[in-house]
Amino acid sequence: MASERGKVKHNWSSTSEGCPRKRSCLREPCDVAPSSRPAQRSASRSGGPSSPKRLKAQKEDDVACSRRLSWGSSRRRNNSSSSFSPHFLGPGVGGAASKGCLIRNTRGFLSSGGSPLRPANASLEEMASLEEEACSLKVDSKDSSHNSTNSEFAAEAEGQNDTIEEPNKVQKRKRDRLRDQGSTMIYLKAIQGILGKSMPKRKGEAATRAKPSAAEHPSHGEGPARSEGPAKTAEGAARSVTVTAAQKEKDATPEVSMEEDKTVPERSSFYDRRVVIDPQEKPSEEPLGDRRTVIDKCSPPLEFLDDSDSHLEIQKHKDREVVMEHPSSGSDWSDVEEISTVRFSQEEPVSLKPSAVPEPSSFTTDYVMYPPHLYSSPWCDYASYWTSSPKPSSYPSTGSSSNDAAQVGKSSRSRMSDYSPNSTGSVQNTSRDMEASEEGWSQNSRSFRFSRSSEEREVKEKRTFQEEMPPRPCGGHASSSLPKSHLEPSLEEGFIDTHCHLDMLYSKLSFQGTFTKFRKIYSSSFPKEFQGCISDFCDPRTLTDCLWEELLKEDLVWGAFGCHPHFARYYSESQERNLLQALRHPKAVAFGEMGLDYSYKCTTPVPEQHKVFERQLQLAVSLKKPLVIHCREADEDLLEIMKKFVPPDYKIHRHCFTGSYPVIEPLLKYFPNMSVGFTAVLTYSSAWEAREALRQIPLERIIVETDAPYFLPRQVPKSLCQYAHPGLALHTVREIARVKDQPLSLTLAALRENTSRLYSL
């Protein structure tokens, strides 16, 4: 028997690929009890008195060897391309090393403390049987992956196994092995429970730092503690790995994570174990790249990481976005509904029907929508909060209830059906010197700066907020304010002059320069609330001088293009081509002004006016551009023509209304999306009919305009401004607020909303 065992050992040593370390693995047992078996066999054979001494010396040698092999063998095993089974280590590239480990593991079942296994002084046949079975198992596994040299070992081992092994001992050995495995698992679980919670370690560094510690995570559960070796060896390996990882990772990073050897007792994945064992981790202690761990962890709603971990915070919030979307700005977001001076979307459903419907819900059809890139920001340097006019005492302070929120421009909707038809009356015409447009306009080329720095900002801000609160009666002052720091420019009160003639104004003042320069010159009369103007180019003959293009390059300037009835007699196909070309400009927001003028100042024949007016209506509707309508002493004919060519729900600006309410009422009824523009004529004491009409027209259907350079406000001395300009529209806004008995801030916001709805600004 001894000679056969020596032969087997010799063959194993010779096929270890010339590696003396692997060959020495057989001669260095890895535990005390297995290492005593050769000594016991020698003692039983010789019966000499030297057996106890030899046994003691061998034990001491084995104790020193066990710790060394627990790391060395696993390192060789991890570096090889071997495949391991759940219970037995399979063949590796280093055959001798794997065989040595297999014999060591098999012996471990006979010596694990705490298991009722065989005593160390078992009979020779039992010891031989155990070792031969190990050889047999090793040789059987090597048959599938190694050469014919390994087959020779298998034949010898099978012969020995057939001669010695007994069936009843095999069964008992299997039961002992299972018990030993169970105790090992329990012990390792205890180690994990104690050490796993006290060792911070990041998953990303686990594999790198565990390689020298024999803790690399294998694909099939490979690792030093995975082998069914003695409990002491497993304990030593586990303790070594944990201590090493703890020393290296204690000061490194957060994240309490399981180590690879903690997966020994179970086949559950490494990531699942992490989640189960460490469910109470802080959100900032996140493993890099482990999304499942991040998702499954519960964390407080506000946790700030450094920039390097920002993507992890984003990943966290994706799974909790229902609960904590916008966690850092939630209060600001909830306060939006309390802002009276918010900027509203043009898509808001508003009923403008004058029928007896106290709570209108929506327009008859959708608005005519335009691409957002057509518009530039109306606020650049004029974004500061409304401070020049005193707030009424009824204007709520910061923090008012949200029930009073978002009522801007809605207060008079309930009065939509209050007005009733009256007998038609004559239009009070205010004389305007439109012939000035035919005078010598400056045709000189003008130098303007082109600036669209805030064009994209307008696209973002255009639909900042959609008002969805129900309407309230006219008397209710349901507005509130916030400090400047809480308001964006788009949410602040301001106005846009919806109709002016910058080309005529520049000509009258002999001004050459940019609109920015013009505002600086007249800065004393341009209030902070000014947010832009729509310049109307109503003489197609002037579209060839390129002045309009230079003006539209300016911030806070938009354009409308059409043919005024005063110039309809000059209308031609070439002018129409120029007109349509100008309307293709991104900042061209309307078609007009156009219409009918039966006053003595208009020299164009009426039939010619009708023809040009009808042609422009058809073009405008085909282009889906809002209409800018001029009408003087021709209201009935105007309505009849518009009914033929304009849909009832079309967006219309009835420009510079100065007449009585019965004149405008039929248009308001037939065109629910029509808005009425009022100028500084309201400030004149003689314009009592216009003020009376203003009282009866709902605030939500009113817009402000200057019609500059005409209609200088009564309060403005000519020494300050000889002609009206867009900044002076604030005087008209104040008069509208006075006539409507509304706070100035609410009136400003309502007019701004109406402008946005009509022109999508």
From Swiss-Prot:
Determine if Metal-binding is one of this entry's keywords: yes
Its lineage opens with: Eukaryota, Metazoa, Chordata, Craniata, Vertebrata
Give the region (Disordered) as residue ranges.
Answer: 1-90, 135-181, 197-294, 318-337, 343-364, 388-486
Q: Which cofactor does it need?
A: Mg(2+)
> Which annotated residues bind a divalent metal cation 2?
E593, H630, H655
Q: Spans of biased composition, class Polar residues?
A: 417-431
Q: How is the cofactor bound?
A: No activity in the presence of Ca(2+). Mild activity in the presence of Mn(2+).
Q: Which Pfam families match?
A: TatD_DNase
Q: Which gene encodes it?
A: TATDN2
Q: What EC number(s) would the UniProt record show?
A: 3.1.13.-
Looking at the keywords, is Protein biosynthesis present?
A: no
The record's Gene Ontology cellular component field reads: nucleoplasm
> A single GO molecular function, which one?
nuclease activity
Positions of a divalent metal cation 1 binding: H499, H501, E593, D707
Native organism: Homo sapiens (Human)
The Low complexity compositionally biased stretches are 33-52, 66-85, 388-402
Official protein name in the record: 3'-5' RNA nuclease TATDN2
What result is annotated for mutating D707E? Decreases R-loop RNA exonuclease activity
